[in-house]
From Swiss-Prot:
Dual-function toxin that inhibits both the serine protease trypsin and voltage-gated potassium channels (Kv). GO terms for molecular function: potassium channel regulator activity; serine-type endopeptidase inhibitor activity; toxin activity. GO terms for cellular component: extracellular region; nematocyst. This is Kunitz-type proteinase inhibitor AEPI-IV. It comes from Actinia equina (Beadlet anemone). Coiled coil: none annotated. It is found in: Secreted; Nematocyst. Keywords: Disulfide bond, Ion channel impairing toxin, Nematocyst, Potassium channel impairing toxin, Protease inhibitor, Secreted, Serine protease inhibitor, Toxin. Its main location: secreted.
Length: 37
């Protein structure tokens, strides 16, 4: 479900693109931006 999806950690990987995305930071209690790519 959507709730369990929001509990996943941010994962760093390799890519040539740079796309702004957001994830829910459970420690901060809010969405935070990261660069996907």
């Amino acid at each position: 479900d959507a709730n369990s999806f929001c509990q996943l950690p941010a994962v760093v990987g390799r890519c040539r693109g740079r796309f702004p995305r957001y994830y829910y930071n459970t420690e901060a209690g809010k969405c935070q931006r990261f660069i996907y790519g």
